[in-house]
Amino acid sequence: PAAGIFTDSPVIKTRRVGGLAARQCATFTFTSQGHPVLLCGGFTSFQLQLFDPDTLDRLAKFDLPMRPSGIEAIVKRDPEIIFLDTSSAYVYLDNEDRIVIGDSKQRIRRIGPVESDGQWEFKEFDSWDMNAYIPNDCFSLTNQNPDGECDALTTVMPDHSGVLWWVTRKGRIGSLDPKTGKVVATDFGGEEIQNSFAIAKSGAYVVTDHAMYRLELDDGMPTQRWRLEYDRGTGRKVGSINQGSGTSPTILGGGKYVTWTDNADDKIAIIVAHTEGVPEGQTRQICRVPVFKSKGSATDNSMVAYDRSVILENNHGFTNALQHKDYSSVTGGVVRVEVREDESGCDIVWESDLKIPSVVPKMSLGNGIVYFYSFDLLENGDRLWALVGLDFETGKEVVRIPTGTGVAFNNNWASIAIAPNGDTYVGTREGFLKVENR
């Protein structure tokens, strides 16, 4: 794979997205031709947007329906409502360059960019209505006091056979066979799912706000193979969305292990478990490693995993770019934990005090650098934001590229993405930026 940015003379390009009300582009995918396809959100709606990778000119856009949380946030003048909602925020790009997303109208959709005579547009290829399986008495301008249940699609993911798995905020889970349209659904009995999930040949790995599950499909029905409870703490922390794990499950060790975090009150912990068979003399859980400062740990982003190692950042103390004022409250911290070769436990390899309020980090296998988005507090109280790289082996800082100051450069829970050619993108409060070699 192409190496991520590692240069003394980078070129930084910024792209504001939206009109008077800017859109934050939080999720990145890249087509087989290298075009960035971004999911960009705002108070009014989400959009899919296609960009030229060189000029960053927008080539096409596709409007998605407004989420009920967006309407409620505007009516109640409370932006936090939006940031506590992860529905419709996860997408993936399939092998035919089509975005697959669950939208706020309880539909699973396949939408892709198409080009004709030099002009680009988005085309919807498929749409499946899940309203029969997901309650939708949701907040709207004409229904500001709903008395029924409102649930929302959070994530859609494919398994190795092409069947689409889906989950909702309130713990519903199901499968959709795109060839036949067959839908089968069940639920977790009231447990919430606020994150994405992981899929391997061994099944789907879903973390709720109570436990980690491994599931397989029995005639389309998601069926539990094992369940492992974790310490969910006594409440939601600053830097997390709900009372439970803030991480999407991550597969590592060639599929042998799955990792996630708990929400313990004093220190959150990294947990690693066997995905399938448990060796004789061992238990399902290989280790539980408390990390970061006492009374100062929380995370709401996926981990980086490579071989037997897990890298996690600390988001404790940060809320969102619209409401956060005191950035000295951001606790900071990064840790690398490794599973022992004999699987007798896990050890901390290195720790860093780097402050990362909210980014989804990425590792470049081309150069062994893990990329984060950090800041320095300036004397005037502003923040100087920077793309920062830590060496995977040592945890030492090897890259620091300042990008800009002010709220426009705050990533605000958006992710980092490394393009196929090595260019590095960061979602920002008012669009996105790209860092490339000169």
Kindly give the residue locations of the regions a language model identified.
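Repeated scaffold domains used in trafficking and secretory/extracellular systems
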Residues: 20-30, 68-92, 132-156, 190-201, ...
